[in-house]
Design a protein with these regions (language model features):
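N-terminal Rossmann-like dinucleotide-binding module
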Residues: 1-48
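Beta-loop-alpha module in the N-terminal Rossmann-like domain of NAD(P)-dependent dehydrogenases
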Residues: 17, 48-111
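Short active-site oxyanion
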Residues: 28-32, 67-69, 169
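Short, Asp-centered acidic motifs that coordinate Mg2+ and/or phosphate
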Residues: 32, 52, 68, 118, ...
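Aromatic/hydrophobic pocket-lining residues that form π-stacking "cages" and hydrophobic walls in ligand
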Residues: 41, 81, 108, 134, ...
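Rossmann-fold dehydrogenase core element
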Residues: 107-124, 144-150
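Predominantly a Rossmann-like dinucleotide-binding segment in NAD(P)-dependent oxidoreductases
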Residues: 125-184
Length: 184
């Protein structure tokens, strides 16, 4: 049986995940996509052959045939959607950051513990082959005693001022990957 996935958020990252699942993960299928801007959800559904789409994420949360939810919506909505999904019995992959406050992050973690649902945060670079190789070399001691780490990241284009303001800015939304790589 394939894992049936709903994607909340049909922007750039939602598109990346829909494409990856559709073309590279035969054990899973995206069966619904939602976005507050319904035309974006419709376009994503049409592009990847996703059978259902809409504007309200509850159509994913309330669907008993959906096993897991990918939260790819704007940062201020991550925690609430993730908690609702887990309370509805669904496993969750949530883009980072979970929230802009420690309190909501801890509340989301607590819901995962209470419900027994899986909660994975989108630290995707942990699974990148090149990062993995560097990590192996560092842990093996072949790189010696590491005292300084210099990381350079590149996105296709800078975020809009509106996005940077609502997502926590460069440190919380983008450099979080660099901090994760340095600590991982």
């Amino acid at each position: 049986k394939k894992v049936r996935i709903g994607i909340v958020g049909a922007g750039r990252i939602g598109n990346v995940h829909a494409q990856s699942i559709t073309y590279h993960i035969p054990e899973a299928e995206v069966v619904c996509v939602t976005d507050v801007y319904e035309p974006a959800a419709k376009k994503l559904a049409e592009t990847y052959g996703i059978p259902k789409y809409g504007a309200d994420f509850h159509m994913i949360i309330d669907d008993p045939t959906i096993d897991a939810v990918l939260v790819c919506s704007p940062t201020p909505t991550h925690a609430d959607i993730a908690m609702a999904a887990m309370k509805a019995g669904k496993d969750v992959f949530c883009e980072k950051p979970v929230d802009l406050t420690i309190e909501k992050i801890k509340a989301t973690e607590q819901v995962a513990k209470e419900t027994g649902r899986k909660l994975q945060i989108g630290f995707n670079r942990r699974f990148d082959h090149n990062h993995g190789r560097v990590q192996q070399l560092a842990k093996s001691g072949k790189l010696g005693n590491i005292e300084i780490v210099k990381i350079t990241s590149r996105d296709p284009e800078p975020p809009s001022p509106e996005y940077a303001a609502s997502s926590g800015g460069l440190y919380i939304d983008m450099m979080i990957h660099d901090f994760d790589m340095a600590m991982f």
